[in-house]
Structure formats: C-alpha cells, structure tokens
C-alpha cells in the first residue's frame, strides 16, 4: 500500500522539449498575427545597416516591440524613417525560437497622419533655425545676368523641360543639369551631393562653375517632398557659396530647403524667371537708353557748336593773325639765297685747307712712323713671350724636382711616424702594466680587510652562530622556545640541535666520570 501512494501520479499534459515549445509558439504567433497594423514612435533608428536592412523599435508610453525592414522593402519606402517619428507600420509578427524573442517585419510604413510629419518638420525647423541656418544675413543676392546656371533636379519629367524652355525664351544661357532622384530612398543624399558638387567646381575648370543654382521638383504630397526636408539637404543649401533658388512643389508647398535657400520660387518656371532677365526687355531698355544717350550727345554738340561760334566771333580774322608771320617769312626767303652762297664759299675754303695737308710726302712720312712703331711693338711682344716661356720652364723644372724628391720625403715621414707609433705602443704597455699592478695591490688590500671583518674569523676563535628554523641568526634567548629546532654553525661546519626548558640537555644526560673503573670481584672466563 505504501508503494502505491509513493508512486508518481499519472498526468494528461503533453511533454514538450524547449525547441518544440518555441516552434509551437512561433507557429501560433505567426498564424494569429500574419498581417497587423501598428501605430508607434520610431526609437533607436540609426539608418540602414551595412547589409541594407534597417533595425529599430516601435514604442508607445507603455510598451515597445522590435522591428525590422528588409533591404528590398526599405528601397521601396516612400519616405525615410527618422528617430522620434510617429508611424503606422504594416507587417507580420515573427519570433526567434533560439532566443524566445518576437518582432514585427515591416512591409509598408507610413506616417501617422500629416500632423506627425508637420510636428517633426517644425521641431527640425526650430533646431536648425537656432543654429542660424535661416538667418537673413546669410542670404546672397542673385546675379543680374548669369553666364552659367546649374540645375539640380530629375533628368526626366516636366520640371527640367519647363526650366530649359523658360530660360531659352527669356535669355538663352549655358545650363548645367545635375541629375538626381527627387523622392525615395537616397534622394536627399543625392540632392545634397549635387549642391556640394557644383560648389566644388573651380571657376577656371573645364566645366564652368555656375553663377546661380536652381533646386527644383514638381508638386506632390508631403511624403513625396520629404527629401527636401532632410537635414543634410538643408545644411548643403545653407553652406552653398553659389546663390541658390529653391523651387520645390507648388506655391503652397513649403519645405525646409526654402528657408535655407537664398531665394524661394513658387514654381520651377518661376525659378527660371528669377534666374535670368527677359532679353527682349533688356534690348528695349538698351535701345531706349541708346536713344536718350544720342539725344544727350546731340544737345551737347549743339551747345558746343554755339559756344565755338561765340568764341570765333571774339577772335580776330585769319588774315590779321597771319600778316606779321607772312612778312617775316618773305624776308627770310629773300636772305636765304645769300646765306647759301656764303656758306658754300666757306665750305670750299675749308676743303682746300684740308687738301693742302694731304700731300703724298706727308702721307709717306706718317706711314713710315706707323710702320716703325708697329715693328717696335712686335719686338717688345716677342721679348715678353720669351720671358713668359722662360718663367714657365723654370716652374716646370721646380715642379719636377719636387716630384722627384717626393718619394724620399714620404719614406722619411713614414719612418718617423712608424718610430713614433712604436714609442707610443711601448709607453702604453708600460702604463697598462703599472695600472694592473696597482689594481691587484688595491684588490689584495680590500680582500684582507674583508677577511678581517668576516664573522668566520670569530668562529675560528671558538664562537658559534645559532640559526632558527628559517635560517635566521638568533641573538637573544627570548627568541627561542622549548622544542624548537636550531642549527649551530661552527668554524668547520654545522650541526642540528633541539632547545629544552631551562637549558637542561635532553634525556637527563649525566656527566661522564673521569675515574677509572674498579675491577670486579667476579672472575673472567677468559
């Protein structure tokens, strides 16, 4: 009976292994929550992982659930998730049996109403505005007549066609288009990189640097225009050194890039109108200004002619002014003939005097003098050359003599150096031997001092050193107790001993008798 009550009672509960239970829970949850919509705030979002997947959590004021967006789904999202954004996520709940954790795999993601996005925009606008990115002092004036216009927009669509058509109608200039995505994943980075890329161009590079930038996109919902609210786009627009016109959406659509841009255009077409003036209007203004200038010039010319006429009436006539000069000219012309005749006579007389000095005998004498002078100079030159040759020969002979005596001089110098080296070597050997002798003597003296101070000498005089069990010297009896093992060191070695109480040798050893043993009365068998 006792065995019956002690045995385990049977049960109807099924027995699971841990993996079976985890798998059953996984199937139950995934079946019950195959498609769910969850409203919550994004928490812990740090952007997509290097694999392309995005991991974060959805939370409210009382709970949180892990969430994941796979790479393929992430690329199809209409807007980018951001930290603190309230969203509605659609997907399925799944678990990990290995760790008993569950999460929602998001298939679609949308903001929880426009109010959530507007609240996020207002918070970002307040924060960036506090940094001064929207200050009016940062705004730059647009150039009146740009030579090159840079456009950041989608290469396909009506926006770029409208901008090019409007610029062509008003004032044809060179347009550079930087194609980008204007919505979806990665569009914000492309727009920011395009703005920075235009600013990085050098003015004298092969691709001309634009004088003004237009960032444009057509109309759309708040989610479609969300890329132009990205912080990276706003900062790139605020940092642009090139004047920037934002033309995103329609006139009623406002994005954060509109506050950071230098000028906001209501539409892309309006941006083109702001960028360039109307050529026909400029031509009309130029024609009107030219007409006004011509009228001013005509009036000035008339006034100057009238002034000249007035001045001419005040001056005497030309005949009166030239009467005296004409008379002087006639008198000078009359005296010119006589002057020429006198000048000719004087020149002829001078020529005759020169000819008188150029007789053949005088020329022969001068030639003889010059020849004699030349001969004397040649003789002096020959003597000078001979002296130079003699001095050079003497120098050569002295150099040869020096070279001939050089081996003997080198040999004598070498012998003297060898003899000096031998003397130095002998002196060095002698000095080293003296140093070694003094060092040995000092070492012997120090060794004798060391031996005299060694405790071994004391032991040779009959003393001993007592050491305890730790081989430490014992200098007082109080340091020992009965029953301790000690070592006694003599001059010729060590022995072991045991301490006793009161200094009595162990075993009550008796003093040996020095008396000879008395012979016994009992006889010996031997």
Swiss-Prot record:
The protein's Enzyme Commission number: 3.1.11.6
Enzyme class of the recorded protein, top EC level: hydrolase
Superkingdom field: Bacteria
One BP term from GO: DNA catabolic process
GO cellular component, one term: exodeoxyribonuclease VII complex
Transmembrane annotation, as ranges: none
Record field: catalytic activity: Exonucleolytic cleavage in either 5'- to 3'- or 3'- to 5'-direction to yield nucleoside 5'-phosphates
Keywords: Cytoplasm, Exonuclease, Hydrolase, Nuclease
Residue segments, region Disordered: 497-526
Subcellular location: Cytoplasm
Disulfide bonds: none
Any GO molecular function: exodeoxyribonuclease VII activity
Family annotation (InterPro entries): Exonuc_VII_L, Exonuc_VII_lsu_C, OB-fold_nuc-bd_dom
Subunit-structure text: Heterooligomer composed of large and small subunits.
Family stated for the protein in its record: Belongs to the XseA family.
Function text: Bidirectionally degrades single-stranded DNA into large acid-insoluble oligonucleotides, which are then degraded further into small acid-soluble oligonucleotides.
Protein name: Exodeoxyribonuclease 7 large subunit
The species this protein was found in: Rhizobium etli (strain ATCC 51251 / DSM 11541 / JCM 21823 / NBRC 15573 / CFN 42)
């Amino acid at each position: 009976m006792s065995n019956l009550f002690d045995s385990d009672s049977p049960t109807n509960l099924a027995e699971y292994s841990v993996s079976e239970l985890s798998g059953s829970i996984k199937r139950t949850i995934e079946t019950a929550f195959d498609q769910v919509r969850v409203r919550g705030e994004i928490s812990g979002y740090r952007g997509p992982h290097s694999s392309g997947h995005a991991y974060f959590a959805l939370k409210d004021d009382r709970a949180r659930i892990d969430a994941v967006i796979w790479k393929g789904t992430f690329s199809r999202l209409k807007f980018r998730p951001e930290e603190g954004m309230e969203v509605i996520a659609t997907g399925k709940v799944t678990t990990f049996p290995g760790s008993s954790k569950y999460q929602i795999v998001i298939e679609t993601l949308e903001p929880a109403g426009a109010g959530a996005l507007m609240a996020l925009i207002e918070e970002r606008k307040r924060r960036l505005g506090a940094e001064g990115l929207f200050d009016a002092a940062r705004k730059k004036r647009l150039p009146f007549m740009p030579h090159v216009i840079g456009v950041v927009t989608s290469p396909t669509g009506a926006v770029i066609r409208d901008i090019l058509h409007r610029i062509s109608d008003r004032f044809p200039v060179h347009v550079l288009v930087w194609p980008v995505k204007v919505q979806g994943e990665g569009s914000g980075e492309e727009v920011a990189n395009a703005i920075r890329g235009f600013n990085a161009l050098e003015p004298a590079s092969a691709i001309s640097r634009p004088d003004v930038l237009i960032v444009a996109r057509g109309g759309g919902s708040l989610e479609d225009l969300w890329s132009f609210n990205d912080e990276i786009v706003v900062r790139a627009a605020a940092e642009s050194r090139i004047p920037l016109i934002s033309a995103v959406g329609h006139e009623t659509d406002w994005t954060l890039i509109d506050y950071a841009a230098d000028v906001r255009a209501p539409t892309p077409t309006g941006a083109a109108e702001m960028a360039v003036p109307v050529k026909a209007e400029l031509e009309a203004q130029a024609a009107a200004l030219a007409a006004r200038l011509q009228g001013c010039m005509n009036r000035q010319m008339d006034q100057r002619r009238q002034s000249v006429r007035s001045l001419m009436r005040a001056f005497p006539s030309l005949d009166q002014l030239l009467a005296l000069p004409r008379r002087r000219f006639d008198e000078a012309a009359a005296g010119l003939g006589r002057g020429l005749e006198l000048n000719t006579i004087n020149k002829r007389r001078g020529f005759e005097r020169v000819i008188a000095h150029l007789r053949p005998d005088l020329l022969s004498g001068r030639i003889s003098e010059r020849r004699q002078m030349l001969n004397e100079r040649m003789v002096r030159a020959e003597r000078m050359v001979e002296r130079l040759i003699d001095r050079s020969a003497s120098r050569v002979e002295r150099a040869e003599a020096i070279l001939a005596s050089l081996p003997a001089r080198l040999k004598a110098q070498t012998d003297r150096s060898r003899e000096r080296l031998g003397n130095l070597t002998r002196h060095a050997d002698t000095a080293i031997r003296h140093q070694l002798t003094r060092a040995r003597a000092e070492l012997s003296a120090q060794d004798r001092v060391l031996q005299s101070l060694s405790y071994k000498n004391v032991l040779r005089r009959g003393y001993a050193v007592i050491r305890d069990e730790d081989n430490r010297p014992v200098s007082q009896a109080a340091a020992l107790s009965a029953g301790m093992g000690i070592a006694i060191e003599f001059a010729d070695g060590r022995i072991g001993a045991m301490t006793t109480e009161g200094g009595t040798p162990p075993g009550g050893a008796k003093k040996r008798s020095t008396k000879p043993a008395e012979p016994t009365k009992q006889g010996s068998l031997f």
